[in-house]
C-alpha cells in the first residue's frame, strides 16, 4: 500500500509540474501575440485595402455615372 501511495504521489507531482509548464508556455505565447502590434496593423491594412478595392468600381460608377 505504501508503494502505491508513493507511485500515486509521484504521478501527481509530475503531472502538476507538467501542467504548470504548459500554462507558462501558453501565457508566454499569449504575451507574444499581444506584444506584436505590427502584425495586427498589417492585418488591418490588408482588410482595409481589400474593402477599398472592392468598393472602388462602385464609387467610380457613382462619380462618372457610367456603369
Curated annotation (Swiss-Prot):
InterPro entries registered for this protein in UniProt: Frog_antimicrobial_propeptide
Report if keyword 4Fe-4S is assigned. no
Family assignment from sequence similarity: Belongs to the frog skin active peptide (FSAP) family. Brevinin subfamily.
UniProtKB keywords:
Amphibian defense peptide, Antibiotic, Antimicrobial, Cleavage on pair of basic residues, Disulfide bond, Secreted, Signal
Q: Which residues form the signal peptide?
A: 1-22
Q: Which cysteines are joined by disulfide bonds?
A: 61-67
UniProt key word Signal? yes
Q: Which GO terms describe its cellular component?
A: extracellular region
Q: Any idea where this protein resides?
A: Secreted
Protein name stated in the entry: Brevinin-1CDYc
Q: Which Pfam families does the entry mention?
A: FSAP_sig_propep (PF03032)
Residue ranges of the propeptide: 23-45
Main role?
Antimicrobial peptide.
Q: Lineage, please?
A: Eukaryota, Metazoa, Chordata, Craniata, Vertebrata
Q: Name one GO biological process term.
A: hemolysis in another organism
- Give the tissue specificity: Expressed by the skin glands.
